[in-house]
Amino acid sequence: CGSPAIQPQVTGYARIVNGEEAVPHSWPWQVSLQQSNGFHFCGGSLINENWVVTAAHCNVRTYHRVIVGEHDKASDENIQILKPSMVFTHPKWDSRTINNDISLIKLASPAVLGTNVSPVCLGESSDVFAPGMKCVTSGWGLTRYNAPGTPNKLQQAALPLMSNEECSQTWGNNMISDVMICAGAAGATSCMGDSGGPLVCQKDNVWTLVGIVSWGSSRCSVTTPAVYARVTELRGWVDQILAAN
């Protein structure tokens, strides 16, 4: 996991605002969640051929579509259109506090893995991803908060991780909990439509899912940290669901 066949290239790394177009298929775990009419409403990440992780607030239903292998939404590239058979939402998901903003989608048929489609590694409960570490988020979310529509091509942005203490200075102490991790405030951000998608960090040369795009500034301010569900804290629940299903 976590090793793209096509290498990503991220500027300044050696809902996405002030990002850049990704190298096509260089984030092979990136999923587009779409309504049956093809409208993209959230992102997600492939964690193995049968499972996708996304945000609980995306409200995925079994009639939605899971698209893997996509780069340009406007082209009929070699995508796989998959169906969810079951959706599991964290039992402690709270839409008021936005705590535990994670859902797992079991696919009705497995994704076919290959050059353009492969899973991301999941952060272990014991992993430490330090503040200041440069990580990358990707998605088809708005490139500015008042844009008329989402971009066709997958966007990416490098963002530094931030400590929860520092993040609380922006959002207030009661908003940022231990099941959240913040990143950004450095000139780029996630925006509407990126929700559920990945925040990945490179650890031991593999890309590891550290955050799930959860919430942030309503105007997608690039000087305000965006908030992600903290995968290391939620890993135990993920393992439980995968083991039982």
From Swiss-Prot:
Belongs to the peptidase S1 family. It holds the Pfam family Trypsin. Residues 16-243 form the Peptidase S1 domain. It comes from the Eukaryota. Its main location: secreted. The active site is at H57, D101, S195. GO terms for molecular function: serine-type endopeptidase activity. Disulfide bonds join C1-C121, C42-C58, C135-C201, C167-C182, C191-C220. The keyword Secreted applies. It comes from Gadus morhua (Atlantic cod). It is found in: Secreted, Extracellular space. This is Chymotrypsin B. The lineage of its organism: Eukaryota, Metazoa, Chordata, Craniata, Vertebrata. It catalyses: Preferential cleavage: Tyr-|-Xaa, Trp-|-Xaa, Phe-|-Xaa, Leu-|-Xaa. Its EC number is 3.4.21.1. Residues 14-15 form a propeptide. GO terms for cellular component: extracellular region. GO terms for biological process: digestion; proteolysis. The keyword Protease applies. Keywords: Digestion, Disulfide bond, Hydrolase, Protease, Secreted, Serine protease, Zymogen.
